Amino acid sequence: SMLSNNILVADGAFPGDDFCIQMEGGVLDSDYNNLVARNGAWIGNREGNWERLLYWQRASGEDVHSLSHDPLFADEAGWDLHLKSSTGRYLNGVWTNDGAGNHSPAIDAGVPWFSHTNEPSPNGGRVNIGAYGNTPQASKSRTNAWLLAMTMNDGGVLKGTNNLLRWSAGNLGTTDLVRIEYSANGGPWTTVANNLSAVPGEYVWDTTTCTSSLQVLWRVVLQTNAAVQD
């Protein structure tokens, strides 16, 4: 089975809603989703139950380009699953803006080669994840440069020499450069690597050279404008 461009939210507060992906058998091809586990729910099961996207990726080999971010639905409790957008969201036949701090990470995060031509402009040149991707009601894209850190957004542990960090980018190209930074305690930031291409958005991190901590954070920063970061 193929599973892509979906937002799957599992909430352990509701009986029977314990997994974003619960495998009973067969073959799964899953990627470019947004998987969110709340209140003790699990991302997926493969040789065990996995509460973090990173652990599910390692155990299953699936969802390597997927997210685990708050999808920022317009009104989740009211079942309005349009994505909040700083540039335009469909609401009862008209368009509204949600402000700069309310832009869904699922916008422009779908399968890169899937069609997006039914989405209104600006559409970022990439389909949105979720129910309204590639439809006239798709939430609109940002027109400024942006970065989104993907790896470990929902937590987890990285150790050793071969840890792949992933991020996504918009309105940036291969000549735009970024740097990777980390903080051991949420305080000062230390540069791990610089002069990396903003796209395709991957870096192998050797964590043995860094201070070990349970509070480590990492971020990706645009070198020409440090305000563009995540």
Identify the function of each model-found stretch.
Residues S1-V64:
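Extracellular beta-rich repeat passengers
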Residues T143-D230:
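Low-complexity, Ser/Thr/Pro-rich intrinsically disordered linker/stalk segments at domain junctions
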Residues W42, D80-L81, S139, W189:
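Flexible loop/turn segments at secondary-structure boundaries
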Residues V27, E119-G124, A227-D230:
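Extracellular carbohydrate recognition
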Residues D17-F19, P71, V127, V178, ...:
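Extracytoplasmic/periplasmic beta-strand context in beta-sandwich domains
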Residues N34-A37, Y55-A138:
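C-terminal accessory segments
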